[in-house]
Curated annotation (Swiss-Prot):
Family: Belongs to the R-transferase family. Bpt subfamily.
Catalysed transformations (reactions): N-terminal L-glutamyl-[protein] + L-leucyl-tRNA(Leu) = N-terminal L-leucyl-L-glutamyl-[protein] + tRNA(Leu) + H(+); N-terminal L-aspartyl-[protein] + L-leucyl-tRNA(Leu) = N-terminal L-leucyl-L-aspartyl-[protein] + tRNA(Leu) + H(+)
Protein name: Aspartate/glutamate leucyltransferase
Keyword Cytoplasm: yes
Amino acid sequence: MTKLAQLKLYATRPHPCSYLDDQEATTVFIDPNATIDASLYSELSAYGFRRSGSHVYRPHCEQCQACIPIRVCADSFTPNRSQKRCLKLNADLVVSEHDSIDNEECFSLYERYINERHSDGDMYPADKTQYRDFLTSEWGITRFLLFRDAQQSLLAVAVVDRLENGLSAVYTFFDPDAEKRSLGRFAILYQLEQAKQQQLPYLYLGYWIRACTKMNYKTDYQPYQMLINQNWVNIDVSSVIKR
């Protein structure tokens, strides 16, 4: 019996959906006492699971299948015209990789981002305990990409997990005053290039929901696949747009 088959799953009670109004959601969690390692989490990611801190979950709503796992085919990705403009605009940034963001500089940026951009969400107000519990994991797969300008000002932080067959974009937060740089987009483009350089075929972007406009950006990175009926399927972009 594989490690995956031995895992216990627990379902939450129905609760208000974070993405669709007037909808209730149910979430399945992996047993929090289970031993998770890089290999097992990579396998779980291939089945559409994500993490919040060290808690591994997947939507499991009885009457709704709107949350569709999506991953970009990094090895065949080519930036489009607007993405090339974004790369050019941010060519002055210096990116460094770290194994921790347990410092005041990074937390201050996170706090500003949450308080100014997501004051209507369940992560507001930001605090250090929630910051650590949400972004970090215990499995040694997480890296933090810090984006700085020529004055060494910290403009953005991207949290990324290294899987066996790709990278997983966990979260990105950035300076709200640098909105014109499109730093969220730039962070994804940077991670796609990192995946390609590391010969990893995919960049996992979490869930895509057609009716949720804040998730529209995930289909801007092509080609991509979606997990449909437990199979990763290459998506015809024109069919997604027309539906």
